[in-house]
């Protein structure tokens, strides 16, 4: 970056407060031009990002907001939670660095611009790798009326893994069926339903060992946290949370080696989570995908997936989904 460009940028703290995150978007001095394609007023909103690495397409997400001529952002990386990031805008193009711990090498830089209503650009890592990325405005997922529910469908029969597949078959050995339960031992692949769903009610029972971590991903994109090890994490990253976005209220106790249940309803972006019969998230909006999402195609049906990339033993049983008709 040139000295002239550095002098044109003044970093400030955003004044908008996201109550569900307990964090503030970081902002930078914007180009004073307003109006028209590529101006600061063209960028605000939620964006579903797709990053094309040499081996696969990865999901990411950013929410951009404008306040008094300044642009701020909250970023979901390849994993992790929504984190403030400083947005620089110059000559109608944006640039931002990925915060530490979001699944990218520290110092990774996004550079992009608006083209045909989409964000397009490059991701450059500190080791010189360069990937293409694109962003589409996230759909509202608003529904016109209450859903009509179909018939319940068991997703796990208790005997084998029929109806499930793995994101990484080479790491599938951590999963197995024991005494009618689906068990994860340690860290490895995610396990994913072969069927995809849009709006649904999901019942799932789980038993989380000491110092263990997993999660239930709705449509493969929104994680409801399961854990007994996040002692230093914020409430919106603990047991019962929609990870990084919505904290359960009241808090869900971490009780290892005990069978517990979630009853989760997802309609559009509206989620309700009931833990052991008590509502802990009541019809709250999920702003966007959570870290580790299988893709960023929020308008499409998606699978149920159980997280396998964290430590510890977690068992599951009685996994039943009731799709909307």
Protein language model regions, located:
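Residue-level detector of intrinsically disordered/flexible regions characterized by low predicted structural confidence
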Residues: 7-11, 26, 203, 319
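Boundary at the C-terminal end of the N-terminal hydrophobic targeting segment
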Residues: 22-30
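Bacterial N-terminal signal peptides
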Residues: 10-22
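Carbohydrate-interacting regions of secretory-pathway proteins
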Residues: 30-325
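N-terminal secretory signal peptides that target proteins for export/translocation
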Residues: 1-6
């Amino acid at each position: 970056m040139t000295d002239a460009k550095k002098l044109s940028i003044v970093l400030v703290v955003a004044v908008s407060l996201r109550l569900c995150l307990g964090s503030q978007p970081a902002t930078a001095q914007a180009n004073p031009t307003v109006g028209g394609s590529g101006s600061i007023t063209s960028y605000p909103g939620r964006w579903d990002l797709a990053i094309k690495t040499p081996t696969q397409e990865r999901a990411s997400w950013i929410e951009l907001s404008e306040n008094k001529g300044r642009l701020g952002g909250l970023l979901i990386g390849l994993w992790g939670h929504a984190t403030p990031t400083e947005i620089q805008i110059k000559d109608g193009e944006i640039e931002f660095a990925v915060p530490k711990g979001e699944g990218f090498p520290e110092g990774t830089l996004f550079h992009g611009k608006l083209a045909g209503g989409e964000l397009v650009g490059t991701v450059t890592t500190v080791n010189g790798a360069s990937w293409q990325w694109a962003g589409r405005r996230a759909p509202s997922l608003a529904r016109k009326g209450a859903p009509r529910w179909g018939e319940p469908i068991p997703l796990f029969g208790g005997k084998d893994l029929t109806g499930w597949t793995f994101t990484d078959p080479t790491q599938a050995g951590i999963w197995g069926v024991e005494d009618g339960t689906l068990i994860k031992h340690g860290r490895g692949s995610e396990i994913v339903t072969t069927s995809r769903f849009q709006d649904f009610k999901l019942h799932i029972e789980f038993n989380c060992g000491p110092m263990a971590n997993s999660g239930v991903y709705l449509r493969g994109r929104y994680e409801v946290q399961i854990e007994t090890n996040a002692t230093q994490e914020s409430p919106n990253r603990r047991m019962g949370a929609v990870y990084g976005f919505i904290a359960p209220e009241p808090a869900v106790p971490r009780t290892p080696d005990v069978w517990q249940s979630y009853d989760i309803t997802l309609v559009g972006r509206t989620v309700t989570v009931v833990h052991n019969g008590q509502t802990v998230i009541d019809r709250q909006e999920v702003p966007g995908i959570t870290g580790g999402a299988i893709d960023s195609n929020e308008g499409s049906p998606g699978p149920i997936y159980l997280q396998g990339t964290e430590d510890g033993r977690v068992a599951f049983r009685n996994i039943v989904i009731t799709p909307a008709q």
